[in-house]
């Protein structure tokens, strides 16, 4: 079952190449710490700067490392429907449990174009699909009405909502039904998101604080919002500090401070400034991570 704390995994590099040994260790650590799912090659996995071959290699490596212990929701989005079909078919072939598919970016499809794109992906395979709606990056915003029509397809099972609009959860419950999975795509607002009916978060911060994020999610899902608020207060400085610069760069730096992963990223991303490093260090101390 897809719910709870689901890290959008970083993709480790070593001297410019994929570091699959470290990736597999991160998968084991995440599962041991309580993460309830994994998303390889999303935005946080630096998918824009991976080749198609690397993209597929990372998906397969995470599926193999997870070995059925938690669901793997493979990043399979593209602004080309043809490329999206290739990626989602590969994810299905290697044993992913679902695919995370971002709304096509840059070419700005209409709502009719979004319907056609996601319908084509749905019809090309038997893999469950989670829509990824992130208008801040893709420029297009899937409306609750369009999502409701897509939710009628049997394998469109949910959404990662990164609109930052908490009211969308209630609107999408109305258009898609209460059983449609709604996962927050924004760590800082995940508390309110779940209070409105969400069931989890595809998280950047969970790369660094998987146990805290998992326990936070568990508290919300059992309706214990007093405990969840205590976790929120502990994690909020880290949510903010990680995103002072691109979030995946912050997450990799924090992981490097824990001795779990290099902070190496690919251009055009660059390493953090010293003031941001200091903020992340302070937030990690506040959370009790270092």
Swiss-Prot record:
GO terms for molecular function: 4-hydroxy-tetrahydrodipicolinate synthase activity. It catalyses: L-aspartate 4-semialdehyde + pyruvate = (2S,4S)-4-hydroxy-2,3,4,5-tetrahydrodipicolinate + H2O + H(+). InterPro entries: Aldolase_TIM (IPR013785), DapA (IPR005263), DapA-like (IPR002220), Schiff_base-form_aldolases_AS (IPR020625), Schiff_base-form_aldolases_CS (IPR020624). Pathway: Amino-acid biosynthesis; L-lysine biosynthesis via DAP pathway; (S)-tetrahydrodipicolinate from L-aspartate: step 3/4. Pfam families: DHDPS. GO terms for biological process: diaminopimelate biosynthetic process; lysine biosynthetic process via diaminopimelate. It comes from the Bacteria. It is an enzyme of class 4 (lyase). It is found in: Cytoplasm. The record marks 43, 106 as: Part of a proton relay during catalysis. Its main location: cytoplasm. Disulfide bonds: none annotated. Pyruvate binds at residues 44, 202. Keywords: Amino-acid biosynthesis, Cytoplasm, Diaminopimelate biosynthesis, Lyase, Lysine biosynthesis, Schiff base. GO terms for cellular component: cytosol. Belongs to the DapA family. Catalyzes the condensation of (S)-aspartate-beta-semialdehyde [(S)-ASA] and pyruvate to 4-hydroxy-tetrahydrodipicolinate (HTPA). NCBIfam families: dapA. This is 4-hydroxy-tetrahydrodipicolinate synthase. It comes from Cereibacter sphaeroides (strain ATCC 17025 / ATH 2.4.3). The lineage of its organism: Bacteria, Pseudomonadati, Pseudomonadota, Alphaproteobacteria, Rhodobacterales.
């Amino acid at each position: 079952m897809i719910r709870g704390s689901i890290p959008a995994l970083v993709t480790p590099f070593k001297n410019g190449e994929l570091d699959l040994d470290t990736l597999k260790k991160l998968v084991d650590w995440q599962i041991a710490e309580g993460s309830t799912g994994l998303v390889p090659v999303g935005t946080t996995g630096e998918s824009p700067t991976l080749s198609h071959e690397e993209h597929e290699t990372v998906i397969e490596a995470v599926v193999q490392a997870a070995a059925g212990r938690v669901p793997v929701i493979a990043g399979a989005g593209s602004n080309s429907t043809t490329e999206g079909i290739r990626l989602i078919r590969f994810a299905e072939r290697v044993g992913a449990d679902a695919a995370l598919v971002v709304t096509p970016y840059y070419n700005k499809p209409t709502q009719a174009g979004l319907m056609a794109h996601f319908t084509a992906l749905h019809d090309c395979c038997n893999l469950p699909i989670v829509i990824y709606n992130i208008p801040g990056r893709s420029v297009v915003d899937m409306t609750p009405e369009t999502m409701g029509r897509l939710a009628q397809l049997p394998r469109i099972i949910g959404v990662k909502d990164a609109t930052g609009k908490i009211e969308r959860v209630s609107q999408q419950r109305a258009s898609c039904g209460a059983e449609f999975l709604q996962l927050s795509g924004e760590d800082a607002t995940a508390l309110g998101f779940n209070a409105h009916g969400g069931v989890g978060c595809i998280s950047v911060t969970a790369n660094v604080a998987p146990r805290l994020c998992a326990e936070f999610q568990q508290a919300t899902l059992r309706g214990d919002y007093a405990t969840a608020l205590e976790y929120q207060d502990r994690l909020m400085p880290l949510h903010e500090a990680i995103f002072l610069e691109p979030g995946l760069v912050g997450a990799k730096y924090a992981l490097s401070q824990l001795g779990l992963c290099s902070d190496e990223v690919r251009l055009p991303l660059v390493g953090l400034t010293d003031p941001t490093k200091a903020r992340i260090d302070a937030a990690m101390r506040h959370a009790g991570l270092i």
